[in-house]
């Protein structure tokens, strides 16, 4: 069963559906792997071994008698501990919520279950989308590539356990980089979807609706192809989150050949390391070899995005009316830029994973991710390189709104050309 550890979720689903392996075997293998690696990582804070084994047996019986329930039938998954899970604690890393047990699932958890997936654990996160991987409830999570480093914030445990092979697929949340930074630091793939594509209902601290387009829920995995599967499971209105728009996903993804790509390695605020710069250039070259028309061009509105971010976070005084005016103008500028390009390629952060419990020395740590939280554009992070310290380096691929699938397709091309996810040192 070691073969399934590190395998794509799509491959696992096909193997279960065709009865080459059983869901019980797969779930047991991942639970055993979590038992092996989690003491060093502290990524999974609630394991659901008993219920997961029971559900896996039921999944195998159903597969034998009636076939698969959905595209993820029998596949294990994990979720960040901000999502409601019926009968299981949901603490969000907040002390006063240590004994909180919801009686219903978050929309995205329910949709994963309906697709046949089996929950095997909930993962650590800092409170209120905090700035490092430390939780006052569960302690800190370590990076599987170097346990002296952080996996990032705030989908910390999710990125760490996926990178370490303990889960093939998971759910995180992102308000300014909380999916994308951990994906970069841990060398996995992740999607921050178009604002309004996936409901945030049942996610602690995610208000949803048009008043909070920055906060999104998205899938995390090791392979870009698994993001595509999860996107189709998760997208669409739930009748509760008023910000979700009933826009159908396209049936076909356009080919990369001929797509226009703008790339930049330096946003002018947070200077990247040479390794980050080299990785972005390599990713741009990979897209060029896939037939994209690649141009080095930095968007002119990155500085304005930083100022707006400071207003949102209270670092800079700005009235609500003035904020709304500048935000509208900013989004118009992004739309104008994206009318010239199909994709934008950039760093995720200026450096690799910071040391454990290190506080970010500057808000510029988010300067590469926050612009696209404010604009609502979909972003995919994929590993495209390795630092001199042997740490993962990801790149950020931004697409036009509602074209999440195009960003995923580009990530797949980079993954194939540059290697993508690699086994973490903690499990070698």
Predicted segments, located by residue:
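An N-terminal boundary/leader segment
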Residues: 1-54, 289-291, 423-428
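Acyltransferase
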Residues: 23-28, 57-60, 274-298, 320-341, ...
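A short helix-breaking turn/cap at a secondary-structure junction
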Residues: 192-278, 418-428
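DPxDG-like acidic metal-binding loop motif
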Residues: 86-99, 164
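Glycine-rich, small-residue loops and helix-cap segments
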Residues: 19, 30, 74, 114, ...
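Short glycine/serine-rich loop segments
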Residues: 104-234, 373, 378-394
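Residue-level signal for inorganic ion chemistry
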Residues: 30, 52, 227, 261, ...
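Conserved small-residue hinge/capping positions at short loops/turns
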Residues: 62, 68-91, 118-121, 287
């Amino acid at each position: 069963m070691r073969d399934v550890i590190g395998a794509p979720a799509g491959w696992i689903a096909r193997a279960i559906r065709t009865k080459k392996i059983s869901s019980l075997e797969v779930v047991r293998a991942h639970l055993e792997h979590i038992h092996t690696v989690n003491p060093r990582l502290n990524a999974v804070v609630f394991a659901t071994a008993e219920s997961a084994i029971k559900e896996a047996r039921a999944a195998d019986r159903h597969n034998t008698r009636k076939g698969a329930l959905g595209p993820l039938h029998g596949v294990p998954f994990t979720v960040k501990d901000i999502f409601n899970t019926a009968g299981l604690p949901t603490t969000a890393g907040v002390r006063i919520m240590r004994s909180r047990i919801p009686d219903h699932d978050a929309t995205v958890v329910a949709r994963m279950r309906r697709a046949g997936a089996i929950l095997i654990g909930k993962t650590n996160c800092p409170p209120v989308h905090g700035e490092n991987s430390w939780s006052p409830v569960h302690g800190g999570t370590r990076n599987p590539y170097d346990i002296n480093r952080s996996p990032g914030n705030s989908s910390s445990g999710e990125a760490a356990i996926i990178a370490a092979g303990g889960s093939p697929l998971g759910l995180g949340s992102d308000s300014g980089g909380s999916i994308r930074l951990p994906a970069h630091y841990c060398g996995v793939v992740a999607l921050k979807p178009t604002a309004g594509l996936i409901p945030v209902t049942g996610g602690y601290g995610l208000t949803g609706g048009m008043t909070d387009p920055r906060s999104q829920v998205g899938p995390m995995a090791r392979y870009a192809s698994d993001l595509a599967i999860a996107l189709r499971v998760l997208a669409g209105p739930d009748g509760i989150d008023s910000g979700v728009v009933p826009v159908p996903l396209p049936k076909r993804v356009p080919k990369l050949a001929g797509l226009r790509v703008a790339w930049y390695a330096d946003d002018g605020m947070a200077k990247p390391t040479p390794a980050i710069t080299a990785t972005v250039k390599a990713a741009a070259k990979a897209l060029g070899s896939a037939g994209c028309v690649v141009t080095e061009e930095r968007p002119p509105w990155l500085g304005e995005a930083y100022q707006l971010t400071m207003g949102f976070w209270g670092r800079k005084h700005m009235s609500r009316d003035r904020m709304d005016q500048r935000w509208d103008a900013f989004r118009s500028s992004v739309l104008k830029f994206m009318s010239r390009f199909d994709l934008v390629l950039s760093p995720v952060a200026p450096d690799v994973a910071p040391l454990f419990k290190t506080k970010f020395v500057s808000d510029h740590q988010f300067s590469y991710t926050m612009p696209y939280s404010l604009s609502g554009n979909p972003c995919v992070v994929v590993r495209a390189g390795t630092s001199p310290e042997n740490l993962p380096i990801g790149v950020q691929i931004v697409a036009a709104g509602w074209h999440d699938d195009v960003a995923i397709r580009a990530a797949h091309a980079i993954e194939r050309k540059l290697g993508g996810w690699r086994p973490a040192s903690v499990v070698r």
